[in-house]
């Protein structure tokens, strides 16, 4: 219910309110009228139902009387049975004794056997039936009695009345009931059967009852009766013109005693109840359905709805007229009383408004403990039961503090801990009640919330401890695994640089491959653990996606060629020259996908396609390998999941590679998807946002514009990419089909030349070529399919055109022919582990550096004080003085030489700690020769510049 905002309204609003009240009164009168009409309708329905009940009682008496007759006849038949041979005993017979008529119910019914075996019993029973007919049959209105043998299934008919009976229909119905009785479950075989058959005339039928006759707990025969039924048997004379329909237990209409128009179709809801009274669908008729025990039949009485409404039609018209008159009178009176009633009420508006505001604030309070406290002294004026209980929990000091807070009106809530350790939060608002300043207080038991907050705090502390334990575990595992692995991989790297005897080189290579695989497994597990513990961070910086792709293809091209596969790398011209992201993690993801493609592909090729897709950089890796079943694609990115059928089981791995890829791409705000078909190959597509992308300027290369290249490329994808790339550079392309070329034309093929090319040059794209384009014969260049995007640079070289960095995104790679000379660099190696210390010294020696060694930080300071050291390469975790304190001490001494840390801890926090201590960089064990060479080259160049 909505309360009015204020009782002090204008007179105009008051008049509208009074009119609304008059309307409500009129609606109330209309409701009463409707209620009266409905009551009259219910009364009429009650009268009709009473007549229905009287008729149904008469029908019930008819059925019950027939059932009683059956019991009497059954008693007579059973008393005339003897246990001898299961036949009836003979009685004294007179000369007028007749044998009943026999009717076979089935084709194999043996009536002769029944007549001969039961002759005496049947004659005795026939004599009694005749006697019973002459003395009692008229009272029971029976047509005939029949006996059916249980063994021969032949019916002995004892006619009690001469009347036409439809023999075929009766025998058919009896045959059906006998079959139903014989097929019934054992617990139902002792029940009586009742049914009704339609007579030759409408409104007349025949009622049948069948009961079993037992002798010594054995079924001997079935005793049945036939009785005519008429309309007067089922409703009282002089009643309403109602329809009478008898239905079976399935709701099927058996007979209508008022003609075919009176048949009522039974509804399923009727059959669920023994007695049902109501209207049929569409409200066409009012019906009463009642069961007729002990039979399974039901009787349905019906009358048209027009007959029900006949008496209340005038009442409805009178009610409508009355409501019209009352409505007119009410609205007339409303206009008269508007000026006489509401003007005196304005003086009471202020009091009513305060009362209304008070009630609204009560309703606005929470449905908890509510009380009204007087502001002056804090006395409880009014409270509910829950508030009374809470107030009794407060101590005297709590009450005084609550009173002071209420009087001060500085805050509107207070938390109180009661004497029984119940946490109460008391909130209040100030108001007026009975001309006094009061505070409406709401008391809430927040003990559960306080306990929950404490539990959450404990859970947070437990989670923090678990995170710290996980970090410690990762650091320990990383250090303990990487330290010995460094000794293995490092020494194998050095061993491969030496000249080895025949056969030993193969063993060293196998050992190096196995150790590299072990390192990859350890790295995958540590990366996944760092991702799960949220310790792995994306380090965005500006990088060139083209350089990343060139580096990846250069690393994997030898492996692809060794497997006799093809690696096609298509970098679209619209790919940015630079963007912001983490190139190391992107390279890790693409390398993992490319490595999987190589492992699972034995025949065909692998395509690496890089292009722009809206605001994303799309990188697609497609192979022609074994493919992945559809049911396993959905689990492909689950941790430790490996495809478990066929060839895949032969490959090694932890099942973490794709899971790490998905998480890394997600951390870069990108996504990864897969499309695979078993036997056809797989396609992985990853997308990363184009943050800070700088696109190449669309500008043709001067000198290439107008040149013509003939294409004889069978690979459709390769051909389309070449056409797009050369069109951007202004080169005209045509499909070569044996035409005569011009002198400056160039032929581009992806297969060996069949004839000598008469043009300027021919470029052959070879799947097995590794490295930069080479001129293996005059005018014949071989080009790798892994660097198709560098074709314009080769054409510029053929046409002797100087490259413009703004026109082309990349140029041909050049080999560095200057050898490094590092013998001017003295490096101090600090490590407490003798194997690692010796290994680092050997690696530095193989790179041309001079080095000195120290056992720990203290020994390193001693070496620094006596020798001129250019670079310090120090382990982090050492006894006496670790790498952190050593670096801090070096910086305190004012030395600015580069300090590079070496740690077996793979956590990001460890590397950050190294940088914070003053180190210039940090390397993770195992440190390969390539990593060591690249890192030291940077700092060696810095030292040389400082010397200069």
Swiss-Prot record:
One of its GO terms (molecular function) is phosphorelay sensor kinase activity. Autophosphorylated. Activation probably requires a transfer of a phosphate group from a His in the transmitter domain to an Asp in the receiver domain. It comes from the Bacteria. Residues 476-692 form the Histidine kinase domain. The modification 4-aspartylphosphate is found at residue 875. Residues 1-20, 335-948 are cytoplasmic. Residues 357-425 form the PAS domain. Residues 42-313 are periplasmic. It holds the Pfam family Response_reg. The chain crosses the membrane at residues 21-41, 314-334. SMART domains: HATPase_c, HisKA, REC. PROSITE patterns: ABL, HIS_KIN, RESPONSE_REGULATORY. GO terms for cellular component: plasma membrane. It catalyses: ATP + protein L-histidine = ADP + protein N-phospho-L-histidine. It is found in: Cell inner membrane. Residues 826-940 form the Response regulatory domain. CDD domains: HATPase_EvgS-ArcB-TorS-like, HisKA, REC_hyHK_CKI1_RcsC-like. InterPro entries: CheY-like_superfamily, HATPase_C_sf, His_kinase_dom, HisK_dim/P_dom, HisK_dim/P_sf, RcsC, RcsC_C_sf, Sig_transdc_His_kin-like_C. The modification Phosphohistidine is found at residue 479. Residues 705-805 form the ABL domain. Its EC number is 2.7.13.3. Interacts with RcsD. Component of the Rcs signaling system, which controls transcription of numerous genes. RcsC functions as a membrane-associated protein kinase that phosphorylates RcsD in response to environmental signals. The phosphoryl group is then transferred to the response regulator RcsB. This is Sensor histidine kinase RcsC.
